[in-house]
A protein has these predicted regions:
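All-alpha RGS (Regulator of G-protein Signaling) helical domain and cognate RGS-like helical scaffolds
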Residues: 2-392
Length: 392
């Protein structure tokens, strides 16, 4: 008689193997499903956001350093307080629209700390100039409104560094390599579209220009032409009323405005824009001739705003040229004793800017309720040209 165990075991063994294999497969599949995959690395923020964040961090660092210098008596607080106010307004302007978006490390550095390494007055001036140069450089690449904000921030920091060096008696920072002369190279050109019914002529436009160049860019170029034409007219009207010590610089500035007007007209032509006719005259502000110096400064500040508009809507060589022209206009405004504001080229309503976190009650924290405008002298001593005697 056959043993039943010997007959059934061989048949059960494959079945057991199948059960074990199926169980292992289920366990493995559940394990892969429960173990989350690695999250992809976050995408790098766009250049404009990185440039804005860097500008904010440096403004806060400089602000903290200025407060430290003033608190330790290493420099005259009366000289440093306007700079701290300037940096405070700039930092508030650089904050992202989203509340609390400033980097935590940057905001933490805004408060002077006993553990922070001391900085000398000369080092502070050099750091301010370095930050201004970096902002101007980034403005040539950043997008639209951020570019305008960076250009104005950098221009104001460079001006403040120069004036602060004079006030503190420390070496003046070396001028940035970027200037009107080095930034005004011509754009690569392509033929402009010919008017309907006419053969295509030799006129040229920048690559991406002509019909492809945004209308707001051509409009901003036309506005720059108008601003320069008005500046030329203003200088011609003011020259006979200026003191001899002011007439020399005014003549140089007049020549520069004529060059800028011609350059703006050429860029507008290359952009296939409609030429701006030369006006026979302009209506000057009441009292312009009675106080020609300060009113020339206001004209320069207005020109800076026109170039700020162009910075926001242009690219490439036009952008670089506009950034440089904005800097120069702000500098000339200061030469005439007019403060172009904390962000030249951009009208700021400081009351609408977000407050810096943790700034309540801090000296220099909130800044003035309104930004120093083109017609005011708030801020560092301008060290302008000699005053003009009252016109008879």
């Amino acid at each position: 008689m056959k043993d039943p165990l010997k007959d059934t075991r061989p048949r059960l063994r494959p079945f057991r193997y199948a059960v074990v294999a199926l169980t292992a497969l289920v366990v493995l599949s559940l394990g892969f499903a429960l173990i989350p995959g690695e999250k992809p690395a976050p995408a790098e923020p766009p250049f404009s956001e990185r440039a804005r964040a860097a500008a904010l961090a440096e403004a806060l660092d400089l602000r903290a350093a200025g407060m430290q210098l003033a608190s330790t008596g290493a420099a005259d607080p009366a000289v440093l307080d306007p700079v701290v106010t300037l940096l405070t307004i700039q930092a508030r302007a650089l904050l992202s629209p989203a509340a609390g978006s400033a980097p935590a490390t940057a905001l933490a550095s805004a408060s002077p700390s006993s553990t922070a390494p001391p900085i000398s007055a000369a080092g502070f001036v050099q750091a301010m100039a370095g930050s201004g140069t970096a902002r101007v450089r980034d403005a040539e690449t950043a997008d639209g409104g951020v570019a305008r904000l960076l250009a104005g921030t950098g221009a104001a920091q460079l001006l403040a560094a120069g004036r602060l060096a004079t006030a503190l008696g420390v070496p003046t920072p070396e001028p940035a390599a970027n200037s009107e002369m080095t930034s005004s190279g011509p754009a690569t050109t392509v033929p402009c579209p010919a008017p309907s019914g006419q053969a295509s002529g030799p006129a040229t436009a920048p690559v991406g220009g002509g019909a492809g160049l945004p209308a707001d860019t051509r409009h901003a170029l036309a506005s720059a032409v108008s601003a320069e034409q008005q500046a030329v007219y203003g200088y011609q009207a003011a020259l006979p009323r200026l003191a001899p010590a002011q007439a020399g610089p005014a003549s140089e500035f007049l020549a520069r405005h004529k060059e800028l007007a011609a350059a703006a007209e050429e860029r507008l032509r290359l952009a296939c824009g409609t030429p701006v006719p030369q006006q026979p005259g302009y209506v000057l502000d009441p009292g312009f001739l009675a106080a020609p110096a300060v009113n020339l400064g206001r004209l320069e500040a207005a020109a800076a705003t026109s170039y700020g508009d162009l910075v926001a809507v242009s690219q490439g060589q036009d952008r670089a040229w506009a950034v440089s022209a904005l800097q120069a206009a702000a500098d000339r405004a200061v030469r005439w004793g007019v403060d172009p504001g904390p962000v030249p080229g951009l009208a700021l309503d400081v009351s609408q800017l977000p407050a810096l976190p943790g700034d309540a009650g801090r000296t220099g924290g909130a800044g003035p309720s309104t930004a120093p405008g083109p017609a005011t002298g708030a801020g560092l001593p301008t060290g302008g040209l000699p005053k003009t005697p009252a016109a008879s």
